[in-house]
Amino acid sequence: MKEFLDKYDTVIFDLDGVITSEQCYWDAAALTVWEYLHSDTYIGTEKLDIAPFNDTYKQIRAKVFCDDKVIYALKGKGVNSNWDLAYITILVSMLNDEYDFNRVLEYAENMSDNVLDEYEILAKHTAENCGGQLEDYLRNGIIWKTIQNCFQEWFLGDEIYAEVYGKEPLVKGKKGLVYKEKPVIEIEAVRSVIKGLSQTKRLCTATGRIFSEMDKPLSEWGIKQYFSTDGLCNYDYVVKAENKLGKTLTKPHPYMFLKALYGTDYDDEKILNGDYDKSKIEKVLVGGDAGADILAAKAMGADFCAVLTGVSGQAARGYFEGLNAEYILNSIADFE
């Protein structure tokens, strides 16, 4: 392991773009946007035949996200959850009489850097434009939850969706993009790095994935045993804490990194009130690929290691340099 790692006793990893690939999530987000806007199951007028979309999703993604420019823009603003990626794209689309995704790109590029405030601003604009109650449009409101459910159907597919949620999908016929998942670098390199780090450090996750979607690749790739059992912070904890405390706690809020560091059984109110041993943070390294990761790490007070395996690849180097990342690596393979 590289010498710079010696000063840390805890390493917290984001997963997507660092260990796991986000490609399948972006495909699912694009399909969700398209179905929600066009299908009469949601707000559209068409009776969509779902089957062809299982094979043509790349073309849909290119159109919805303007050859991924929308993804780059929103991720650069700190949008972490891919449910939020779909949600923002849909709400901005609803502001226009015709669904012009170039308008979505323009909106995304002009958003402020405080993305946590942007959600409510967008919800208000869309509610005023389309009618209805503001609370329906808010993040975690009924529209957001409907979008989330549609997303999960595409990502998990009919069979796994039914297993995870204990009910049949609203729209059947989705094969599941989860079966196409791959690590962001060669799996042998991932295993070597994670196993090596675990010899001397507590390894944690802070991921926008729910437990089942985090657990599947970590288990199947043979690396879950190297992570601390009370350090596997996933999006289920965010949902639970947000519902309890009434605050937005997704990254770039530091909640997830703090929850991983102090243990997933650590009290959420204590985390929000700063009631924890802050001296531990000095020996924490956060590994991530996105703006939301470094902003959350800096808010926490932890050192940050950027890896250039995320949405922007090598082009993200200047961004991370501008935010004073302590380390910038091509991938986690460079830990060795």
Task: List where the protein language model places each region.
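Acidic, Mg2+-coordinating phosphoryl-transfer loop and its flanking beta/alpha structural elements
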Residues: G208, L285-Y327
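Short beta->alpha linker loops
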Residues: C24, R209-I210, P252, D289, ...
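Short acidic-hydrophobic, aromatic-tinged amphipathic segments that line or gate anion-handling sites
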Residues: C233-N234, E326-F335
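Substrate-recognition "cap/lid" segment bordering the active-site pocket of phosphatases
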Residues: E181-I185, C204, I210-L285, G291, ...
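Phosphate/oxyanion-binding active-site loops and adjacent basic polyanion-contact surfaces
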Residues: S21-Y25, G78-N82, E186, L249-F257
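Non-catalytic, alpha-helical, charged scaffold/linker segments
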Residues: S39-D40, K47-D158
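Active-site neighborhood of HAD-like aspartate-dependent phosphohydrolases
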Residues: M1-C66, D84-Y87
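Short, acidic loop-to-helix structural element flanking the phosphoryl-transfer center
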Residues: K2, I12, G132, N149, ...
